[in-house]
Amino acid sequence: MKKAILATKIGMTQIFNADGVLVPVTVLEAGPCVVTQIKTVENDGYSAVQVGFGDKKEKVVEKDANGKKSVAHRHGVNKAQMGHFKKAGVSGKRFVREFKFENADEYNLADEIKADIFAEGDKVDVTAISKGKGFQGAIKRLGQHRGPMAHGSKFHRHQGSNGACSSPSKVFKGKGMPGHMGSVKVTTQNLEVVRVDADKNLLLIKGAVPGAKKALITVKETTKSGK
C-alpha cells in the first residue's frame, strides 16, 4: 500500500461527468493528516507510518488555593498522549491510525498527507463503522422472505423454522435470527474517485460509502487493482 488517508463523511450529492452522465457521489473531507510517528523494522519490528487527523484540545487539570481540582476539556487529549504528539512536533489529534506504507521511509515527522495524494480515476477501498439500526427482525437484518400476506396466514413477517425439534434438538450456531443490526466495521472495495478538490481537501467518491455523516472514514488504494 502506497496511499491512504483519514477523512470524515460530509454527505451525498450528484455531479455530471465529462460525458454528461449524472453520477451519484459521496463527499469526504480528506485530511490534512499529519505524521505523528514513523515505525521502523529496527525499532518496532515492522515498517509503518502513524498519522493523526482532526484537532483536539488538551485536557487540563488545575487546583485552586484550597486544593480543589477543576478540569478543562475533560474529554481532551491526556498528558501521555500530548507528550507523544509534542515529540512529533504536532498539536493534539482526535484520531490516530497506522498505515503500512511501502514507502514509509520517505516520510518525516509532522509531514502532511492531503487529499491530492489521490487522483481522478483512482480505485479505493473505504472503511467505516456502519449506521446502527438497533434490534431488527430476520427480514430486514438478513433479507429472509416474509410469509403470505393473505387473511388466513398464520404469520407475515415472522421468522421461519429454526430446525427440527426431536433431532438434533438444538439450534445450530450461525442460524440467521433476529438481533442487533449495524454499527460494525464495513469495507466497500474498488470505488472510483470521481473528483479531487485539493484546495478544500475534498474527495468525491462514486456511489455510497458506509457510515453516518461526520463518521471517520479510512480511504486506501484498492487491493483489487486491475480487476
Curated annotation (Swiss-Prot):
Keywords annotated in UniProt: Ribonucleoprotein, Ribosomal protein, RNA-binding, rRNA-binding
Similarity comment: family membership: Belongs to the universal ribosomal protein uL3 family.
Entries under PANTHER family matching the protein: 50S RIBOSOMAL PROTEIN L3 (PTHR11229), LARGE RIBOSOMAL SUBUNIT PROTEIN UL3C (PTHR11229:SF16)
HAMAP family, A to Z: Ribosomal_uL3_B
One Gene Ontology cellular component: cytosolic large ribosomal subunit
Record note on quaternary structure: Part of the 50S ribosomal subunit. Forms a cluster with proteins L14 and L19.
Organism lineage string: Bacteria, Bacillati, Bacillota, Clostridia, Lachnospirales
Protein name as it appears in the record: Large ribosomal subunit protein uL3
Keyword Metal-binding attached: no
Residue numbers spanned by region Disordered: 146-167
Gene3D superfamilies for this protein: 3.30.160.810, Translation factors
